[in-house]
UniProtKB/Swiss-Prot annotation:
A motif ('HIGH' region) lies at residues 49-59. Gene3D superfamilies: 3.30.720.200, HUPs (3.40.50.620), Isoleucyl-tRNA Synthetase, Domain 1 (1.10.730.10). This is Isoleucine--tRNA ligase. It catalyses: tRNA(Ile) + L-isoleucine + ATP = L-isoleucyl-tRNA(Ile) + AMP + diphosphate. Monomer. A motif ('KMSKS' region) lies at residues 591-595. Catalyzes the attachment of isoleucine to tRNA(Ile). As IleRS can inadvertently accommodate and process structurally similar amino acids such as valine, to avoid such errors it has two additional distinct tRNA(Ile)-dependent editing activities. One activity is designated as 'pretransfer' editing and involves the hydrolysis of activated Val-AMP. The other activity is designated 'posttransfer' editing and involves deacylation of mischarged Val-tRNA(Ile). GO terms for molecular function: aminoacyl-tRNA deacylase activity; ATP binding; isoleucine-tRNA ligase activity; tRNA binding; zinc ion binding. It comes from Methanothermobacter thermautotrophicus (strain ATCC 29096 / DSM 1053 / JCM 10044 / NBRC 100330 / Delta H) (Methanobacterium thermoautotrophicum). Belongs to the class-I aminoacyl-tRNA synthetase family. IleS type 2 subfamily. PROSITE patterns: AA_TRNA_LIGASE_I.
Length: 1044
C-alpha cells in the first residue's frame, strides 16, 4: 500500500494501542530475537524489582533506560539477552501479607496462620503483583522476555543459591558466630547494613554517675539508657588527658578537654591523669539494685582507641551485648556478653526490674531510677541520625546473637581487584563511592529469622554440632533419612521436615531454621538466572554480563551483593559495565511519598501524554546518574516536540500521497538537490552519529536533546520552511522530487534514531511512510539495522547554514525595527562582516538567504558604503583639558568627514584639529563615533556581522506585498473550509480599482499559491465570504471549491 496521508493530530493512546496490538499479533519481539540469533551476543542482567506492589516513577525510569539501551544494541546488530528478573522473597512481601492477614508478630504467624499457609500466601501475593507489574512495564513499551523471567522463588533458582553457600563453606567463608548485629524488634530478625535507612531521631541524652568511692564518680554520657542494664565496663582513651573535676561537693572523672563544656567554668580540676592510669579502676554499676546480676560482676575501666572528644565525656559506656565496637573490645578484655533482650526487643528476666518491658519504653524508668539514686547529673534530649528497618520503619537495636556470616573481610582485597575490571558510568560511582563501601565492608550477616525466603541449606547435628551444607535438590534427596520433598518445593516448612544423618557421629541433622538475606537471592542472579551449575550451556554463552544498571542505593545493595557472591562462587565479578542512575523526586527535589501528597504515578503521565512522551522525558530531563526532579511543565515541552514531529510527518505524507511519491521510482543520482537538501541530510546523519555515541556512552540525556533540537529547530522551523514552496509545484518537477526524496530519507533516519526512546510513534510512522514506500522493507522498524551515513555529513555546510540562520534572524529583527512585514519583499539586503568565513557562507547560500529574507538582491561586503560616520568630541576626556576651547573642536569635528577622522586615527593614532590659529591633537579616547544610515535603510547585528536592508516601497515591491497579503487571507479561508491541499477553488475579490491594478500583475502567483482555477476582481458572492482589511484597503473575498 502506497504512502497514506497521516491523521491530522498526534493521538498517542490510539497509536500505542495499535502498535502494541501489532507487535503482539505479529509476534514481532520474538521475530526480532530470531533475526539476530546468529549475531554477536550482548549480555544484560536485569536488577530484579520487588513484587510487592505497583511500579513507581523510579521503577519506570529504570526499565525505560534498560529498554532504550537494549533496543539500540539490538539494532546495532547484537543478539541481546534481556530476561527480566523478579525479587520475590523477604520482608517487603511478608509485611504486605501480614497486613492482608491481620497479623502483627511472628507469634501470630506461627500460632494463628501457620508457616505453610503464610508462605503460600506470600507466594500468591508475589505472583499476583508480578503479573500486574509486568503489564505496567509492557504498557511502557518495554521489550523483555516476559514469558521467561528469572524468579527468585523458582526451585532451580534457589538451588543455584544453595550451591553458592556450599562454595562458601568449601572455601571456609561460611561461619556461625556470636556477634552484635543490627536487629529489627518488629520483624524479629537480623538486618544487614544495606537494609538500614538512616533518619533524624530524637533520643534521651543523659550524663550518668558511675560510683567509684565516696563522692567520686566516673561520668558517662549515653543516648541509649536501655543498654545500661548490660553495661560491663567504661572505656577511656589511653592517650587522652583525664581530670578529677570537683563541682558541688562531688568529684567527676572525665576527659579534661570536656570539663568546661559539660560541668561549666565553676568546676575545679583537682588532678590530671593519662587514660592509661585509669585502666583497671573499678566502679559500682549504677543499676546494681535494679539488675541484681551486676552485684556478682566486677566492673572496671578499660582502654579503647574508639573513644573520641567530639561529644560526651571521654568515658564511654561499654555493653558488649549491644554494640559492635563494645563487643570487639569486650573480647579483648574477656568481658562477659550480657544481652538481656529477646527477639521482640523485650527485656528478659536477666534485666531484673525491667523484665517484660520493651527496651525503648524502659528508658524513662531507667532515667527515673538513676535520678532517685542521685546518679543522674543531667538529662535532656538529642536529635541525631539513627538507623531504621528498611521495611517496617522501626528503630533498630543492637543485639548479640548467633548468626550465619559470610567472611567478606577475608575476600575484600580480591573484591577490590575485581572492581578494577568494571567500567562505571559515571566513573566516580565505582572509583569512590563503591570502592569506599567495599574497603569498609564487614562480614555479611546472611541469616534471617523469618519464613518467606530461601531456606539456609545448612543441617546441624543434634549430637555433635557438625554441619553439612547442601548444594542441590538432588543432593538433599539422596541424603534425606526422614521427611520427603513435595516435588521440588524447598521452601519452609517442607524443607524443615527433612532430616539427614550426621557423617561424623551418625546423629540426626536438622536444618537451621533461618532463611537467607534477600540480598543473597539477587546477589546470585548472574548464574542462578542461567540455572548454573545444574545447566552449563547458557552460562558458557552469556556469562559474565556486559551491562547492568540500577539506582545509586545499589552501591551498598545489588552491585555489592553480586560482587561478593561472584567472588565467593566464581572468583570473579559477574558484570563488566555498570550505569548507576539517580532517584526520581518531585519538582522541589523532595522524595515522593504518599504522606507528602507529591507522588506522580506512571499511569497518570501515560493517561495524559502517552508512554512515548514519558519515556523520552525521563531520558531527556537530566543526566541519568543525577536525581531527576519531575516537572510537569518540562513534560509539556516534550509533548510539544512529539506534536511537531507528527506535524512534519503529516506535511510529508499529505504531499507525498497526493503526488503518489515512491522513493524507489527516482534514483538519488538523477535528482538535483539544493544546498538546503544536502544540509538537512548532513544534519540528520550528524545527529545520528552523536546519538549513537551518546547512547553507547549511556548519556541518554545527550541523545534525546540532540533529537529534540533537530526536530524542533532544524527540521520543523527551518527545513520545512525552506521547502514548503517546492511542494506546490507540478507533480514530477525534479526540484519537488528532490525535496520529497530528502524529506523521506531524513524522516526514515530520524525515526530509526528515535525508535529506542519512542518505539510506538516511530513504529507507526514506519508502517505508513517506509513500508508504504518500500513494501519489501522489514515488517517492523525494530528489525532494521541502525542507520548511519557518515558520508553524507558536511561539517562546513552545517557551519555555513548556522551562519545563514543567524543572518535571517538579524534580518527579522531589522524588519521589526522598521515595522516592515516579512511577507513584504525588500529591494536589497547587504551582509557586512570582517570575517571571511561569514562572507563565504552568505555567498554560498545566497539563494537561501534571498528566499528566507524575502529580498530581491543579496550583497556581501566588509563594510556598508552608504553609512555615514559622524565624529563628536568626548567631553569626559576633553573637558578638563580644553575647557573653553571645546566648542571650537566640536564645530570642526562635526563639519569634518567622519570616515576621514576614523581613518586618520586608525593609521596615525591621532587626528589634528586646526581652528582660529590653534592646533589640537586628539586621540581615539577623545573622539566618539556615531553612525547614520540613509533613509529607508535599517540594520541589525548578528554574531559575526550586521545586515542592512532597504525598506523603500517601490510600486513593484508594493505589488508583490499586497499580493502576498491577499494570498494569506485566501489561505485562511481555505483552512476554515478544511479543504484538501490539492482542492482547487474559485475566488472572487471586491476591492478598489487601485488595489486591483496593484495586484493584477501578480495574478499568476496568487492563483498558484491558493490553487485558484479562477480569480475574478469582478466581484460576485460565492459559497464562503469574508471581509478583510489589508493596510488601509477594505476587501470582501468570496470562495468556493471548484468543480472537478
Amino acid at each position: 500500500m502506497p504512502i497514506q496521508e497521516a491523521e491530522k493530530s498526534y493521538r498517542p493512546h490510539r497509536i500505542e494501542e495499535k502498535v502494541q496490538s501489532f507487535w503482539e499479533e505479529r509476534d514481532i519481539y520474538e521475530r526480532v530475537k530470531e533475526l539476530r540469533e546468529d549475531r554477536p551476543r550482548y549480555s544484560f542482567l536485569d536488577g530484579p524489582p520487588y513484587c510487592s506492589g505497583r511500579i513507581h516513577l523510579g521503577t519506570a525510569w529504570n526499565k525505560i533506560m534498560k529498554d532504550t539501551y537494549l533496543r539500540f544494541k539490538s539494532m546495532k546488530g547484537f543478539n541481546v539477552r534481556r530476561q527480566p528478573g523478579w525479587d520475590t522473597h523477604g520482608l517487603p512481601i511478608e509485611h504486605k501479607v501480614e497486613g492482608l492477614l491481620g497479623v502483627r508478630s511472628k507469634k501470630d504467624i506461627e500460632d494463628k496462620i501457620g508457616i505453610e499457609e503464610f508462605v503460600n500466601k506470600c507466594r500468591e501475593f508475589a505472583v499476583e503483583n508480578k503479573a500486574v507489574m509486568t503489564g505496567q512495564f509492557q504498557r511502557l513499551g518495554v521489550w523483555m522476555d516476559w514469558d521467561d523471567p528469572y524468579v527468585t522463588f523458582d526451585p532451580a533458582y534457589m538451588e543455584s543459591c544453595w550451591w553458592t553457600l556450599k562454595r562458601a563453606h568449601e572455601k571456609d567463608l561460611l561461619v556461625r558466630d556470636l556477634r552484635v548485629i543490627t536487629w529489627c524488634p518488629r520483624c524479629e530478625t537480623a538486618l544487614a547494613l544495606a537494609e538500614i535507612d538512616y533518619h533524624d531521631k530524637e533520643d534521651p541524652s543523659i550524663y550518668v554517675k558511675f560510683p567509684v568511692s565516696g563522692d567520686t564518680h566516673i561520668l558517662v554520657w549515653t543516648t541509649t539508657p536501655w543498654t545500661l542494664p548490660a553495661n560491663m565496663a567504661v572505656a577511656v582513651h589511653p592517650d587522652f588527658e583525664y581530670a578529677y573535676a570537683r563541682l558541688d561537693g562531688e568529684t567527676y572523672i572525665m576527659a579534661e578537654a570536656l570539663v568546661e563544656k559539660v560541668l561549666g567554668e565553676e568546676a575545679e580540676i583537682l588532678k590530671r591523669v593519662k587514660g592509661t592510669e585509669l585502666e583497671g579502676l573499678t566502679y559500682r554499676h549504677p543499676l546494681d539494685d535494679e539488675v541484681p546480676l551486676h552485684r556478682e560482676i566486677e566492673h572496671r575501666v578499660i582502654l579503647g582507641d574508639h573513644v573520641t572528644l567530639t561529644e560526651g565525656t571521654g568515658c564511654v559506656h561499654t555493653a558488649p551485648g549491644h554494640g559492635p565496637e563494645d563487643f570487639e573490645i569486650g573480647k579483648k578484655y574477656g568481658l562477659e556478653v550480657i544481652c538481656p533482650v529477646d527477639e521482640a526487643g523485650i527485656f528478659t528476666e536477666e534485666a531484673g526490674k525491667y523484665s517484660g518491658r520493651f527496651v525503648k519504653d524502659a528508658d524513662e524508668d531507667i532515667i527515673a531510677d538513676l535520678r532517685s539514686k542521685g546518679l543522674l547529673l543531667k538529662a535532656g534530649t538529642i536529635s541525631h541520625r539513627y538507623g531504621f528497618c528498611w521495611r517496617c520503619k522501626t528503630p533498630i537495636i543492637y543485639l548479640a546473637t548467633e548468626q550465619w556470616f559470610l567472611k567478606i573481610t577475608e575476600i575484600k582485597d580480591k573484591m577490590l581487584r575485581e572492581l578494577d575490571r568494571v567500567q562505571w558510568v559515571p566513573s566516580w560511582a565505582g572509583e569512590s563511592r563503591f570502592r569506599n563501601w567495599i574497603e569498609n565492608a564487614r562480614d555479611w550477616t546472611i541469616s534471617r529469622q523469618r519464613y518467606w525466603g530461601i531456606p539456609i541449606p545448612i543441617w546441624i547435628c543434634e549430637e555433635c554440632d557438625s554441619i553439612h551444607v547442601v548444594g542441590s535438590i538432588d543432593e538433599l534427596r539422596e541424603l534425606a533419612v526422614e521427611g520427603e520433598l513435595e516435588g521440588d518445593f524447598i521452601h519452609r516448612p517442607h524443607v524443615d521436615r527433612i532430616v539427614l544423618e550426621c557423617g561424623e557421629c551418625g546423629g540426626r541433622m536438622k536444618r537451621t531454621p533461618d532463611v537467607l538475606d534477600v540480598w543473597i537471592d539477587s546477589g546470585v542472579a548472574g548464574w542462578a538466572a542461567l540455572h548454573y551449575p545444574s545447566e552449563t550451556e547458557l552460562f558458557r554463552e552469556w556469562f559474565p554480563y556486559d551491562f547492568i544498571t540500577e539506582g545509586h542505593d545499589q552501591t551498598r545493595g545489588w552491585f555489592y551483593s553480586q560482587l561478593g557472591c561472584g567472588v565467593i562462587a566464581l572468583d570473579e565479578v559477574p558484570y563488566r559495565r555498570v550505569l548507576m542512575h539517580g532517584f526520581t523526586l518531585d519538582e522541589e527535589g523532595r522524595k515522593m511519598s504518599k504522606s507528602l501528597g507529591n507522588v506522580v504515578e506512571p499511569e497518570d503521565v501515560i493517561e495524559k501524554y502517552g508512554a512515548d512522551v514519558l519515556r523520552f522525558y525521563l531520558l531527556w530531563e537530566n543526566k541519568p546518574w543525577e536525581d531527576l526532579k519531575f516537572v510537569w511543565d518540562e513534560l509539556r515541552n516534550v509533548n510539544k516536540m512529539f506534536n511537531i514531529l507528527w506535524n512534519v510527518y503529516v506535511f510529508a505524507t499529505t504531499y507525498m500521497s497526493l503526488d503518489r511519491f515512491q522513493p524507489g521510482d527516482h534514483s538519488a543520482e538523477d535528482l538535483s538537490f539544493r544546498d538546503e537538501d544536502r544540509w538537512i541530510l548532513s544534519r540528520i546523519n550528524s545527529v545520528a552519529l552523536k546519538v549513537t555515541e551518546a547512547i553507547e556512552n549511556l548519556h541518554f540525556h545527550r541523545a534525546t536533546r540532540e533529537i529534540h533540537d533537530f526536530i524542533v529547530e532544524d527540521l520543523s522551523r527551518w527545513y520545512i520552511r525552506l521547502i514548503r514552496s517546492r511542494t506546490w509545484i507540478e507533480r514530477d518537477d525534479p526540484d519537488k522530487l528532490a525535496a520529497y526524496h530528502t524529506l523521506y530519507t531524513v524522516l526514515k533516519t530520524l525515526i530509526v534514531t528515535l525508535s529506542p526512546m519512542a518505539p510506538h510513534v516511530c513504529e507507526d510512522i514506519y508502517q505508513n511512510l517506509v513500508r508504504g514506500a518500500e513494501p519489501d522493507s522489514p515488517e517492523s522498524i525494530h528489525m532494521l539495522d541502525w542507520i548511519l551515513d557518515e558520508g553524507a555529513v558536511d561539517s562546513q555546510l552545517e557551519a555555513d547554514m548556522d551562519i545563514v540562520r543567524e543572518i535571517i534572524e538579524a534580518c527579522a529583527r531589522a524588519r521589526d525595527t522598521a515595522r516592515y512585514k516579512l511577507r513584504w519583499p525588500v529591494r536589497e539586503m547587504v551582509v557586512v562582516s570582517e570575517d571571511e568565513g561569514v562572507l563565504k557562507a552568505a555567498e554560498s547560500l545566497k539563494n537561501v538567504i534571498a528566499e528566507q529574507a524575502n529580498a530581491k538582491s543579496i550583497k556581501t561586503s566588509t563594510e556598508f558604503p552608504d553609512m555615514k560616520i559622524i565624529a563628536r568630541p568626548n567631553p569626559a576626556t576633553l573637558g578638563p583639558r580644553l575647557r573653553q576651547d571645546i566648542p571650537l573642536v566640536m564645530r570642526e569635528l562635526e563639519g569634518a568627514d567622519g570616515s576621514a577622522v576614523k581613518a586618520a586615527l586608525d593609521s596615525d593614532g591621532e587626528f589634528t584639529v586646526e581652528t582660529d590659529g590653534k592646533k589640537f591633537k586628539l586621540t581615539s579616547e577623545d573622539i566618539v563615533f556615531e553612525t547614520e544610515l540613509p533613509e529607508n535603510i535599517v540594520s541589525a547585528q548578528f554574531d559575526g556581522g550586521s545586515v542592512f536592508i532597504d525598506t523603500e516601497l517601490t510600486p513593484e515591491i508594493m505589488s508583490e506585498a499586497m499580493a502576498r497579503e491577499l494570498v494569506r487571507r485566501i489561505q485562511d479561508m481555505r483552512k476554515d473550509l478544511d479543504l484538501d491541499v490539492e482542492a482547487s477553488i474559485e475566488v472572487s475579490v471586491k476591492c478598489s480599482e487601485e488595489f486591483r491594478e496593484l495586484t493584477e500583475p501578480q495574478r499568476e502567483f496568487i492563483e498558484n499559491e491558493v490553487r485558484a482555477s479562477t480569480l475574478s476582481f469582478d466581484y460576485s458572492e460565492l459559497e464562503y465570504t469574508k471581509e478583510w482589511k489589508i493596510s488601509d484597503e477594505n476587501l470582501i473575498i468570496s470562495i468556493k471549491p471548484a468543480k472537478v
